């Protein structure tokens, strides 16, 4: 009975589960209607959102097109503005360049040359060149102090006290470049020896911020004209360091000293490591007009050349090479024979001008000449000062002779160059006692030369 009861209960339970799993049709219908109604509403909302989005996109596109048009108009305006600015800049640049050009007529022809900015500034009254010395006047002392400060800054190896002492020394004179009202931008301090007709340039410097305007060259031209006009001085002597040699060469200075040693020896200051240089001034030249004078000389020379030659005639190109690659006889080229050309000249022109070792030898020789110990060997020994020298030394040699031989391409190999260099030192040691300055300088300079040549691998074996 219990088992029957359990089976009945199980059946009832199964039935209830079946009933619960059957869906109510009425309820389902209502839910479907609600779902369908809600679904329609959602679709409408999505369509409205898409339409609004499309309208927004169209508005954005229209706005973007308007912005692009505005940008294009703005770019066009900016481009026009930039072009106008560029044209204005070019016009200003042309005007600035024309300001530096000076022209003059000679023999019916106009000649032009470019002036340095320093010349234009002086012409416009922005700068002036003043000669000052220590006369206790307030303004001159201010200028001398400005010069002293520039020299001390630009010449750091010089003792500051030494510079101050010479600048303020009453036997020295200075020419200063002064920017108005009273700013010193550079200058030269020199000591004239009127009775000996030379002056020693002691200091020469331009402020580091003003070195691209041609002040240095214009200052030297002013100094030359001033000294010639106010004194019998016709020569300048100065000791230049390695950095100043180039500047002084451009101003007409040379390492070749034509003045007799008795004129200047013991009068000028000797600087260790400096190179003595000389400038010989021409009496009939006004150095401030040197550009115009040189251009006039060039014009006169060209005029004389045109009178006896046809080298100024410009001929049209040869038609021979237009359709042909065959060689042409040079003698048939119009104007070539008249110019004096010969086949031998062509052969000479094809030869190499310098030997393969020239650059190396030139560099080593320049280093030797600029060395502090080179002064005894710079020139050949004076026969009048040392009468027995050439009796003892049968094969004399010096650095200036080596320079002449190098320029004449006499050294065919590096061995020949080293031989002459060693000859300089060996001659010195053969003639002088080992306790002398000359003997010691020979050792120092030879040691320096050996070190320099050892730096070049292909020639290092020559000094080992």
Swiss-Prot record:
Residues 31-90 have a biased composition (Acidic residues). Its main location: nucleus. Residues 127-282 form the N-acetyltransferase domain. One of its GO terms (cellular component) is SAGA complex. One of its GO terms (biological process) is positive regulation of transcription by RNA polymerase II. It comes from the Eukaryota. Keywords: Activator, Acyltransferase, Bromodomain, Chromatin regulator, Nucleus, Transcription, Transcription regulation, Transferase. It catalyses: L-lysyl-[protein] + acetyl-CoA = N(6)-acetyl-L-lysyl-[protein] + CoA + H(+). Acetyl-CoA binds at residues 204-206, 211-217, 243-246. Residues 356-456 form the Bromo domain. One of its GO terms (molecular function) is histone H3K14 acetyltransferase activity. The record marks 200 as: Important for catalytic activity. The active site is at residue 200. InterPro entries: Acyl_CoA_acyltransferase (IPR016181), Bromodomain (IPR001487), Bromodomain-like_sf (IPR036427), Bromodomain_CS (IPR018359), GCN5 (IPR037800), GNAT_dom (IPR000182). The keyword rRNA processing does not apply. Transmembrane segments: none annotated. Residues 20-30 have a biased composition (Basic and acidic residues). Residues 1-99 are annotated as: Disordered. It is found in: Nucleus. SMART domains: BROMO. Its EC number is 2.3.1.48. Acetylates histone H2B to form H2BK11ac and H2BK16ac, histone H3 to form H3K14ac, with a lower preference histone H4 to form H4K8ac and H4K16ac, and contributes to H2A.Z acetylation. Acetylation of histones gives a specific tag for epigenetic transcription activation. Belongs to the acetyltransferase family. GCN5 subfamily. PANTHER family: GH11602P, HISTONE ACETYLTRANSFERASE. This is Histone acetyltransferase GCN5.
